[in-house]
């Protein structure tokens, strides 16, 4: 039975190549809304970055890749935007940045970093429920994540987002984020732990 298990911990480290095609950082990626729904908040411990929670994401990503896209967008059980298969999602509309509230998505470290960078640039980030059609008509959209970093979304469901390429605010946030994780942004140095 599962009531007398002893925890075991394993840590593995290996070189991690770019999660997305390096050109995707500049041109953006094509995304497909998944037929799979993000887990309901009461189905599992949605805030846990636990291996078992990722089968939903794996299925959604596989479906998107099979359709010729680079990533999936998952909706929650009520049809609102939740997140990507392994990333948080943001959109920009009329100079304001929006991202889904945390009900159905992981509270990502990179997500939090973008909140701080955006605020330091004078932009407001609003957390609220977002409909899929709001993403369709956004000026810009992008994913954030530890592996994905900051990657522009150029298209959702064969509809171009904004100009159909990386938007200017996404590019600015991306540039500062990349400078930060490479130790070139002194104002965010406390986020880093140098290793030799």
Residue ranges and their predicted role:
Residues 1-196:
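Helix-start/capping segments and mature chain N-termini
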């Amino acid at each position: 039975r599962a009531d007398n298990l002893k925890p075991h911990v394993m840590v593995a480290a290996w070189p991690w190549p770019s999660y997305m095609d390096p050109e995707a950082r500049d041109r953006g990626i094509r995304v497909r809304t998944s037929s799979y729904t993000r887990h309901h908040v009461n189905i599992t411990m949605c805030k846990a970055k636990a291996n078992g929670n990722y089968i939903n994401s794996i299925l959604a990503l596989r479906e998107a890749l099979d359709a010729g896209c680079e990533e999936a967008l998952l909706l929650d059980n009520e049809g609102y935007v939740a997140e990507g298969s392994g990333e948080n999602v943001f959109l920009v509309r009329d100079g304001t940045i929006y991202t889904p509230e945390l009900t159905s998505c992981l509270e990502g470290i990179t997500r939090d970093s973008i909140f701080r960078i955006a605020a330091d640039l004078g932009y407001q980030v609003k957390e609220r429920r977002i409909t899929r059609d709001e993403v369709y008509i956004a000026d810009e959209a992008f994913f954030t994540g530890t592996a994905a970093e900051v990657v522009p979304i150029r298209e959702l469901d064969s509809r171009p987002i904004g100009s159909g390429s990386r938007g200017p605010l996404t590019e600015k946030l991306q540039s500062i984020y990349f400078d930060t994780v490479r130790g070139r942004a002194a104002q965010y140095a406390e986020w880093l732990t140098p290793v030799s």
